[in-house]
């Protein structure tokens, strides 16, 4: 399940290309998450409006995508590089780690919609593996 050096380069290249639309991808992915998996709204009960496309959902989606971009920069050591985020999600926020995989799926859908030509099968495989490793790194402190 590890990424080859070619796949790491593919991930970095693709994320570089989509940087102009990363906010849109993050906002749309989180909107899809709360729409398709409504149980995830329970993590955002403190928001006035947790409906798809609302300002808080959009803002948190952008923040989340920023974290994914940070992870791209730490692609060679995701577990070590994301340890504090793993601790935050495990001990403070108490997010069920299955939700990382659900959000990753929503991100893949959005990436493929917004960048249909760039989202080749090779990019799909590399980004999917990267997001799976990212989810695993975020779940590190749950063990």
Swiss-Prot record:
InterPro entries: Globin, Globin-like_sf, Globin/Proto, Hemoglobin_a-typ, Hemoglobin_oxygen_transport, Hemoglobin_pi. GO terms for biological process: hydrogen peroxide catabolic process. One of its GO terms (cellular component) is haptoglobin-hemoglobin complex. Red blood cells. O2 binds at residue 60. Involved in oxygen transport from gills to the various peripheral tissues. Hb 2 is a heterotetramer of two alpha-2 and two beta-2 chains. This is Hemoglobin subunit alpha-2. It comes from Gadus morhua (Atlantic cod). The gene is hba2.
